[in-house]
């Protein structure tokens, strides 16, 4: 079957760069691409965080929008920005029915549950350390190595 006969699903990918290594970028993108047509691909990190700097190069290479947050590194600053952007995306782009979130952080569980209540398919992409609560909240969860 050719791809043109398959129904196109509009999907969005959000990556918590503080929580997942940039070495996993290709793997994450590959999984997300299988979920539908990605209209949005973003990775998040703090401007002054050495750990997430490697995401900037990777993002350029893979055409992922690199979101750098300035200011003091407050707890959950990146997480809160991602949650806000996910909600904006859903509100502004009605055709998005699949949301891919790359993280192993339990803090996204409520956001995932809320998206599911709104009828969205939520695909979690995370490492072995991802907690059961997050895995169970997602429509599907892919563990990456």
Each predicted region: which residue ranges?
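Class I SAM-dependent methyltransferase SAM-binding "motif I" and its flanking Rossmann-like core
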Residues: 134, 143-144
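Acidic beta-strand-to-loop metal/phosphate-binding motif
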Residues: 44, 97-104, 111, 115, ...
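Domain-level signal for Mg2+-assisted phosphodiester chemistry and nucleotide/NA-binding surfaces
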Residues: 1-91, 113-117, 121, 129, ...
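Receiver (REC) domain switch/active-site residues of two-component response regulators
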Residues: 139
């Amino acid at each position: 079957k050719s791809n043109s006969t398959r129904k196109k699903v509009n999907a969005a990918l959000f990556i918590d760069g503080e929580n997942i290594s940039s070495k996993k970028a290709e793997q994450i993108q590959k999984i997300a691409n299988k979920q539908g047509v990605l209209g949005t691909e973003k990775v998040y990190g703090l401007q002054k965080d050495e750990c997430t700097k490697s995401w900037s190069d990777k993002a350029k290479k893979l055409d992922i929008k690199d979101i750098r947050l300035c200011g003091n590194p407050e707890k959950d600053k990146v997480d809160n920005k991602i949650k806000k952007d996910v909600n904006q995306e859903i509100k502004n782009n009605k055709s998005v029915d699949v949301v891919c979130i790359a993280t192993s952080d339990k803090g996204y569980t409520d956001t995932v549950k809320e998206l599911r209540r709104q009828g969205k398919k939520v695909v979690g992409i995370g490492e072995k350390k991802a907690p059961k609560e997050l895995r169970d909240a997602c429509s599907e969860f892919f563990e990456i190595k």
